[in-house]
Regions:
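PAS-family sensory domain signal
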Residues: 1-44, 96
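Generic recognition of flexible, low-complexity loop/linker segments
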Residues: 2, 62-64, 76, 94
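Long, contiguous hydrophobic alpha-helical segments, chiefly transmembrane helices and signal peptides
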Residues: 2, 45-46, 53, 57, ...
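PAS/GAF/H-NOX family sensory domains and closely associated sensor/linker modules
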Residues: 30-57, 61-68
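Extracellular Ig-like/FN3 beta-sandwich strand-entry sites
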Residues: 70-72
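PAS-family sensory domains
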Residues: 75-84
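Short loop/turn elements at sensory-signaling interfaces that couple input to output
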Residues: 86-115
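PAS/GAF-family sensory domains
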Residues: 117-119
Length: 119
């Protein structure tokens, strides 16, 4: 999934969908807060990863990282698909001018090589 993501409004504009990430209709969400709530409430994030995911991926944490530290975020977690949980990467890339006035970042979500085949 390739999207533009607004760190102020939470709006997500999909540029390209990846059919391998399809499942449970979550790939059609356009609001970050709704997307995150569904991932957690529907246990689409593995229960062992949920607390860390919840703390790292809040809009406030992402704004701090993007606006002040000017760093990208790369987070790997186990996400549920119809066939079970698979390692997934969620990556956010700001440009050098990322700020409250220019809050757009690139979001990429893709399958990640498993670091532990037994999950």
């Amino acid at each position: 999934l390739l999207s533009r993501f607004n760190l102020i409004t939470g709006g997500m504009e999909t540029i390209k969908r990846d059919s391998s990430l399809a499942g449970f209709g979550i790939e059609y969400e356009t609001d970050y807060q709704t997307y995150m709530s569904r991932l957690l409430d529907e246990q689409l994030v593995h229960p062992d990863d949920a607390d860390e995911f919840r703390s790292i991926m809040t809009l406030d944490q992402l704004r701090l990282r993007m606006f002040h530290e000017k760093g990208s975020v790369i987070y790997r977690f186990r996400r549920k698909f119809k066939a079970g949980y698979f390692w997934t990467s969620l990556e956010l890339f700001p440009d050098a001018e990322c700020s409250k006035e220019n809050p757009w970042v690139v979001m990429v979500i893709h399958e990640s090589p498993s670091v532990n085949p037994d999950l």
